[in-house]
């Protein structure tokens, strides 16, 4: 689920010839630094769990072991950390939020009265968007940084891995490309699947 938030700090401001320690830009930057060091918890759904289980069969060595490990009831922390260091796998393992824009101040010689940053999140299907907002607030650890959704989210549950459909895909794949493994994957980008699922079409 695609969801963006404005993070904003307001301040009385002033003139740069009389600087103060309480600076909207500094406060926002410190909050963003804390957010950058925060990871949402590991959360696999049916699709991502199957993805890592089947990808493990194609990988070798430590990568194969790590992919198997993250699908276990008690995932190995080292395996989670190693996969999380790879952006394409990290985005499959958890909800992600990242700062993408910053705006502040109005003049070279004026202390900023506002500083704000756009944070874009990719919320795992089935996870509460409001819960993600509350998690961001806790990660920022500063009640002077407001967190406001840019627009209402369009939540969606994950697409089910329908065994009947999957078997048909595997059968045809086997006929045309013998030995090819079918691996379901969850896109971290937006797709029309969101609207189809909400219309009752899996």
Report the location of each language-model feature.
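Short amphipathic alpha-helices in soluble, non-transmembrane regions
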Residues: 22, 31, 132-140
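C-terminal catalytic subdomain
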Residues: 110-132
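A common structural junction motif
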Residues: 35-39, 137-145
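Predominant activation on well-ordered alpha-helical scaffold segments within soluble catalytic domains
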Residues: 6, 26-33, 96, 170
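A short core secondary-structure module
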Residues: 12, 16-42
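A generic structural motif
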Residues: 11-17, 106, 121-128
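Hydrophobic, small-residue-rich alpha-helical packing segments that form membrane-like cores
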Residues: 1-3
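An extended, acidic, His-containing surface patch that forms the Zn2+-binding/catalytic region
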Residues: 46-106, 113, 130-134, 146-202
